[in-house]
Amino acid sequence: MALQLNGVAVVTGAGSGIGKAVALAYAAEGARGVVIADLNLEAALQTARESESIATSPTYRALPVAVDVTDEKSVDRMVTAAVQAFDRIDYSVNSAGIGVKHHKPVYKAEVSEMNAFWQVNVLGTLNCIKSVTKVMKSQSVSTLNKQGKSRQVGRGVILNVGSCNSYIATPDIVPYTTTKHAVMGLTKSAALDLAPHEIRVNAICPGWVNTPMVTAAINGNPDLPEMMRTIIPMSRIAEPEEIADVVLFMTSPRSSYVTGVGWVVDGGTTLQVQTC
């Protein structure tokens, strides 16, 4: 089933992990352009080079950009660069974030750590939504041609990276769980506000994924691998490419009537716990 992803994507956090997998997947699926944004420009450049080697569109172009999502002006510069290079933004994937490095109960939680999580995971996502929305609102509506029929599929799609912790709580990771819950609230609110403008907003909510972020979490808690094997019904963590597959579907015309939802991709982990 072709996803018909021949537009332009902006992916933050694209220097590693899920963001990198998503950027590469867009290139392989036929996107004509991908803005590969990361705080680490060298990492973004490396992803860009890799994407060029697997791109399937004959006119594909990768645009590596340094961005600090906590800085509104930096985000605006990224979006301006995207428009100057490609004229529009069809898919915006907000993957930049920080994960768990230290496990502490709530009575030992540090305000400084909470602020750091909030700045990146929540305000960083908000900054990207605000800036990209200004572009999407003014661009033309895309059309899907299928089986001899055509239908309008909107002006653009925004996909935020949440977590299965957007729905559940895990002991000793208060800042992470709190901010990932907030990402889901932001996603739902933005979906309501932007639906009249024909812009969809959703979230993907992974469990543990084989990324540097999870490696850092394991370094902070050596018991984590055994716990993962015990509580994940599929008995393994996800690969970044498995998350990217869902991201591509959720931003494609094939999901054109889906907005305001979080798609949990966790190998069945949350099936065994009560969600909110």
From Swiss-Prot:
Keywords from the named record: NADP, Oxidoreductase
Oxidoreductase listed as a keyword: yes
Known EC number: 1.1.1.-
CDD domains reported in the protein's UniProt record: SDR_c
MF terms in GO: oxidoreductase activity, acting on the CH-OH group of donors, NAD or NADP as acceptor
Annotated catalytic residues: Y176 (proton acceptor), Y176 (proton donor), K180 (lowers pka of active site tyr)
InterPro entries, per the entry: NAD(P)-bd_dom_sf (IPR036291), Sc_DH/Rdtase_CS (IPR020904), SDR_fam (IPR002347)
Keyword NADP listed: yes
Reported consequences of knocking out the gene: Abolishes the production of (2R)-annullatin F and (2R)-annullatin G but not that of (2S,9S)-annullatin D and (2S,9S)-annullatin H.
Residues involved in NADP(+) binding: I18, D68, K130, Y176, K180, V209, T211
PROSITE patterns membership: ADH_SHORT
UniProt record, GO biological process: secondary metabolite biosynthetic process
Catalytic function, reaction form: (2R,9S)-annullatin H + A = (2R)-annullatin F + AH2
Role according to the record: Cytochrome P450 monooxygenase; part of the gene cluster that mediates the biosynthesis of annullatin D, an alkylated aromatic polyketide with a fused dihydrobenzofuran lactone ring system that exhibits potent agonistic activities toward the cannabinoid receptors. Within the pathway, anuF is involved in the formation of (2R)-annullatin F from the diastereomer of (2S,9S)-annullatin H (compound 12).
Family to which this protein belongs: Belongs to the short-chain dehydrogenases/reductases (SDR) family.
Name by which UniProt lists this protein: Short-chain dehydrogenase anuF
